[in-house]
């Protein structure tokens, strides 16, 4: 096992213990939502701190960043990117679907990824060039070339709904094609699920690169491709639309999806 992967696993499991302990505790909090958010913020801080302590103990000269930090190119230093809680709203609502992630970047390349679901005890790991694993077993994405009966996850922040009904038109096109849609509230877990074949595809309408670095390596090492699903870049809302799919032997799946969404753009214009 890669020595940095070993440290990342040790750190993320310790962080997961804090998340689980407080997940059970916060069920009994009766304060208003604002106070509960402060409680969650404190949990995230503790999680980030314990993960950082484990990493610094072995690699005191490395740089550790969290998901709110702007990622800059750094050829000299090794960077550790921590997302201490992806799926925060699920956690607040006691919906057990969230995760922690660590990504290790060396010479501007993501080399190691760990995603941990502390509730299910699912540990997704990936090392560049060595594939992806779930709980120590090699995983690969599904090999499909049809939209029928496929399951697609969607990441769309609520703020986009208020601006346009355009996304609802996309949903309609996809549903009529026989697709089952999911909006789970944790894009990182969605990427891990695409990598492991639990989900066939992810549409990300609001990608935040530093948040999803770990998930993208997981998907890529499992045989997935990530690409833009529209060529139109005139509107800001369209610039960040990406599709990660389990496209392993045929481009038919991507072509069909692109065709459906292109129809929506034409109709919208």
From Swiss-Prot:
One of its GO terms (biological process) is signal transduction. Its cofactor is Mg(2+). It is an enzyme of class 3 (hydrolase). CDD domains: IMPase. Keywords: Chaperone, Cytoplasm, Hydrolase, Ribosome biogenesis, RNA-binding, Transcription, Transcription antitermination, Transcription regulation. Belongs to the inositol monophosphatase superfamily. Part of the processive rRNA transcription and antitermination complex (rrnTAC). The complex forms an RNA-chaperone ring around the RNA exit tunnel of RNA polymerase (RNAP). It supports rapid transcription and antitermination of rRNA operons, cotranscriptional rRNA folding, and annealing of distal rRNA regions to allow correct ribosome biogenesis. This subunit may play a central role in organizing the structure. This is Nus factor SuhB.
